[in-house]
Amino acid sequence: PFKDPNQQVKNQQLKESCALTVLLGSHHRVYYYTGIPTETAPPTIKTTYFKPNGGIRDIIIAKMKEVAQRKASGELGAKDNVAVLIKATPNSTYKDMVDMLDEMNINEVPVFAIVDISPVELEFLAVPEADATKP
């Protein structure tokens, strides 16, 4: 039977400490933030790329280590896992999406989903994306 890849994330309530949101932008830029933003606390969006050192892979590895340490300390339960939400902007490329899915596989991310980017997130990216188009 067909299994909705987003269903696993829908069925589990994301814990703020386990959430990593990845926004695929233009010019192979990868924006990301941790946690779950609210109206009163917008996210702090950071920028990286698909590069061997210091890229999105290192961000994912760091998040997985952080969650593992919190599990070991008892702060998180045994079933709590990193959950990566992948969102593509209209200016991102198919290759970037494939590369991001490869990163999920390489890093053995237990829970991830491809979801639509929100209008609010597009607003957050308006300035960094405008800067990306400048030579």
PLM regions: where:
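Short beta-strands and strand-coil junctions in structured, solvent-facing domains, enriched
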Residues: 5-9, 66, 91-94
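Periplasmic peptidoglycan-binding/anchoring modules of Gram-negative envelope and division proteins
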Residues: 48-76
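Extracytoplasmic juxtamembrane/flexible linker immediately downstream
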Residues: 1-50, 76-78, 113-135
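Soluble extracytoplasmic domains of inner/organellar membrane proteins
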Residues: 77-122
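Charged, alpha-helix-enriched surfaces in structured cytosolic catalytic cores
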Residues: 17, 51, 55, 92-99
